[in-house]
Amino acid sequence: MTQTGKRQRRKFGRIRQFNSGRWQASYTGPDGRVYIAPKTFNAKIDAEAWLTDRRREIDRQLWSPASGQEDRPGAPFGEYAEGWLKQRGIKDRTRAHYRKLLDNHILATFADTDLRDITPAAVRRWYATTAVGTPTMRAHSYSLLRAIMQTALADDLIDSNPCRISGASTARRVHKIRPATLDELETITKAMPDPYQAFVLMAAWLAMRYGELTELRRKDIDLHGEVARVRRAVVRVGEGFKVTTPKSDAGVRDISIPPHLIPAIEDHLHKHVNPGRESLLFPSVNDPNRHLAPSALYRMFYKARKAAGRPDLRVHDLRHSGAVLAASTGATLAELMQRLGHSTAGAALRYQHAAKGRDREIAALLSKLAENQEM
């Protein structure tokens, strides 16, 4: 709920209108504290009437801090959070992530606490002891709590959001990413089992996400046009997998394949991918019709990274390595965002859309990097 900032000057109390059109009334009590009406009002006259009642109570010496607060509804945080989670229009994986955050980090402290009783001090105490060893989980937990309380504010269940810790939603990176070198990528690729060598090549040189690669099908590869089309992704939900859309709208994209990769991808399609447009490029080890489980790939990748002397390298770091390689060609940030399928509101405001056709130039320059390495 965003305020317009318009305040009405009055002899007693204050009235302000929200962007929603509703009105809020508040006043300073005889004890010097500011009191806010327990709910907002459809009409300004109703807000004025509430203030008139409070002024009359003060004049008649009938006032108390509880005056006018009797009709404020109460709601335990746990009950409200469950409803909040059910009503959110979010992807299954995000919902599962929020569920885990609530169960593991938030509900143990706040489940039975009334929303009105969650104070900034209570939030600070909770934050000080929550997921201290896992900064990302800690930041996500705080962000979720803040989002739920912000909705409670919009629902007029609380007067203000108690989540006010500056920077708490941002995690300081513990794992410092060191991109793989071309030599390391070559070693890792060769150390992988044959059916999954192309996975490493495409994860790095095309900078693709794990879920995009494991849902990639024969129909998505255009060798003649030298393009990989990303239209779907797969996510782990419980014990199974679910095909969904890419992580963001920008994730739906055509990625130009560096020309030097075409022979390897063509060979992979010929030797390791079943016939048919719907055949997965990188299926399960035991079933060509099932998606590849992360744990199965990790077992192979961990051995390969050890051979390259890079025990610190994660599968997702291959994507980061690819971004660094693409950046080294002189690609602009906007072009990199297009190639990576990454977009944020802030970036959209700061940078123009990537120039059409430049992605193929970037891909060609990537191949030149590889050719120079071989010389």
Curated annotation (Swiss-Prot):
Lineage: Bacteria, Bacillati, Actinomycetota, Actinomycetes, Mycobacteriales
Metal-binding as UniProt keyword: no
Span of domain Core-binding (CB): 75-153
PROSITE patterns on file: CB, TYR_RECOMBINASE
Cited InterPro entries: CB, DNA_brk_join_enz, Integrase-like_cat_sf, Integrase_catalytic, Integrase_recombinase_N, Integrase_SAM-like_N, Tyrosine_recombinase_XerCD
Species, as recorded: Mycobacterium tuberculosis (strain ATCC 25618 / H37Rv)
Induction trigger: A possible member of the dormancy regulon. Induced in response to reduced oxygen tension (hypoxia). It is hoped that this regulon will give insight into the latent, or dormant phase of infection.
GO biological process: chromosome segregation; DNA recombination; establishment of integrated proviral latency; symbiont entry into host cell; viral genome integration into host DNA
Recorded superkingdom: Bacteria
Family statement drawn from the similarity comment of this UniProt entry: Belongs to the 'phage' integrase family.
Protein name: Putative prophage phiRv2 integrase
Active-site residues per Swiss-Prot or TrEMBL entry: 209, 316, 319, 342, 351 (o-(3'-phospho-dna)-tyrosine intermediate)
Signal peptide: none
Known function: Integrase is necessary for integration of the phage into the host genome by site-specific recombination. In conjunction with excisionase, integrase is also necessary for excision of the prophage from the host genome.
CDD domains: INT_ICEBs1_C_like
MF terms in GO: DNA binding; site-specific recombinase activity
Residues covered by the Tyr recombinase domain: 175-364
Keywords carried by this UniProt record: DNA integration, DNA recombination, DNA-binding, Viral genome integration, Virus entry into host cell
